[in-house]
């Protein structure tokens, strides 16, 4: 049995807490702690969608892989890839990335990240219940390359999951969610900033503000 009760979680959501896997630095363990408040329903929905993706998805760069369950002293643990930068530091959220924008180059990089994210979701027909900047990690795989990763709200909760099985329904849902996503304050404020170009020619942003 894996002991997690003495660990501080990496993050806490509405229904789940995420812990570092004590036996594998490349993975994390999520624990459902609000089972009676929709937590069980959420994990069942997510795992059902992951099973669907496991049969067809070839490019996993934009979402964490799921690796099954383990027993912990906090209950059943669900094991996923941990998203960390090439230098070992935790990847920051898109919200944090947007808040760090100080120069024209930063905004250009933010726009490029958003373009990458939208293309990945469309090309791979990834269905999400919602899109929120705080649930998207900016995975820095080198000094010059960042990949957006959706780490929560994957799948759909409708009785008949049309977007999961129909490309047309999937694209329509994605467009609706994208409009709401771009309008969220964390992104809207950053994208409307009137910024000056930076004087140096270094990379605009990394995982931590310079």
From Swiss-Prot:
InterPro entries: Kinase-like_dom_sf, PhoP_reg_network_YrbL. This is Uncharacterized protein YrbL. Induction: Induced by low extracellular levels of magnesium via the PhoQ/PhoP two-component regulatory system. GO terms for cellular component: plasma membrane. It holds the Pfam family YrbL-PhoP_reg. It comes from Escherichia coli (strain K12).
């Amino acid at each position: 049995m894996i002991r997690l009760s003495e660990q501080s979680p990496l993050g806490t959501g509405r229904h789940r807490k995420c812990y570092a896997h004590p036996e594998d630095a490349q993975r994390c363990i999520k624990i459902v702690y609000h089972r009676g408040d929709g937590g069980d329903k959420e994990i069942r929905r997510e795992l059902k969608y992951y099973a669907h993706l496991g049969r067809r998805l070839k490019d996993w760069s934009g979402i964490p892989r799921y690796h099954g369950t383990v027993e912990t002293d906090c209950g059943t643990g669900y094991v996923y890839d941990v998203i960390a930068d090439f230098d070992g530091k935790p990847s920051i959220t898109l919200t944090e990335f947007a808040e760090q924008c100080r120069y024209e180059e930063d905004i250009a990089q933010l726009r490029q990240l958003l373009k990458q994210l939208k293309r990945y979701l469309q090309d791979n027909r990834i269905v999400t219940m919602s899109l929120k900047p705080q649930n998207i990690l900016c995975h820095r795989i080198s000094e010059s390359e960042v990949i957006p990763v959706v780490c929560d709200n994957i799948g759909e909760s409708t009785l008949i999951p049309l977007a999961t099985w129909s490309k047309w329904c999937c694209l329509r849902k994605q467009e609706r969610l994208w409009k709401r996503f771009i309008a969220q304050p964390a992104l809207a404020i950053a994208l409307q900033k009137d910024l000056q170009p930076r004087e140096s020619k270094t990379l605009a942003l990394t995982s931590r503000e310079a």
